[in-house]
Amino acid sequence: MAEMSYRTALVTGASSGLGRGLALWLARRGVRVFAAGRRLPQLQALRDEAQAAGVTVEPVELDVTKADATLERIRALDAEAGGLDLVVANAGVGGTTNAKRLPWERVRGIIDTNVTGAAATLSAVLPQMVERKRGHLVGVSSLAGFRGLAGHAAYSASKAFLSTFMESLRVDLRGTGVRVTCIYPGFVKSELTATNNFPMPFLMETHDAVELMGKGIVRGDAEVSFPWQLAVPTRMAKVLPNPLFDAAARRLR
């Protein structure tokens, strides 16, 4: 693994799941971590766990669906930290959105968090990182973003947005000193997947997924996809002709 070069990091969606795990993973390696999320009690419990281990995690109450407030708060954190070295846009929500009964409220909730919230989180520090000629932006997308999955129109589309957003940032920021990484998890045990009522092949333990994420981020990988058993066929499905993909997708409903 490459040498850890981060002094400070912000991880959104750190109340549980991958965000919580990554915040602890970074803190245990000497990084001062700002753990952001909507549920302050869970963040305070995370801080206490970190303190018991002799490391630093600072809770930050933040609702990324409120874009203007998110921009303001993260910019203030950047100034307080003397420049955030790593920002991980991890906050996300799921939920089914069957096109036959497409509830706008649910669609909007997914877009507000997964699209607007992620873009605001990363945009808040991007100009400062470019000016400093250093920094690392990470977006947590999903393997579900490669094709439109049945019953997940809003979720798949929101993750497709983030994937393309991160790719464009990576191209634009080449040579600036700012690195860009996009994470593509498959199914990971978390609050997000606990309510799923459909098969989840190659379901991963959270700590295993966090280890893959953390190592990929530190290496500066452009993309980190896991588990490979699901990542490989998912990427191959990207080039399937529509009739073949549609037939396969119908079987997965």
Curated annotation (Swiss-Prot):
Its EC number is 1.-.-.-. It comes from the Bacteria. It is an enzyme of class 1 (oxidoreductase). One of its GO terms (molecular function) is oxidoreductase activity. NADP(+) binds at residues 10-34. Gene3D superfamilies: NAD(P)-binding Rossmann-like Domain. This is Uncharacterized oxidoreductase MXAN_5909. SUPFAM superfamilies: NAD(P)-binding Rossmann-fold domains (SSF51735). The active site is at 155 (proton acceptor). SMART domains: PKS_KR. InterPro entries: NAD(P)-bd_dom_sf (IPR036291), Sc_DH/Rdtase_CS (IPR020904), SDR_fam (IPR002347). Coiled coil: none annotated. It holds the Pfam family adh_short. GO terms for cellular component: membrane. Substrate binds at residue 142. Keywords: Oxidoreductase. Belongs to the short-chain dehydrogenases/reductases (SDR) family.
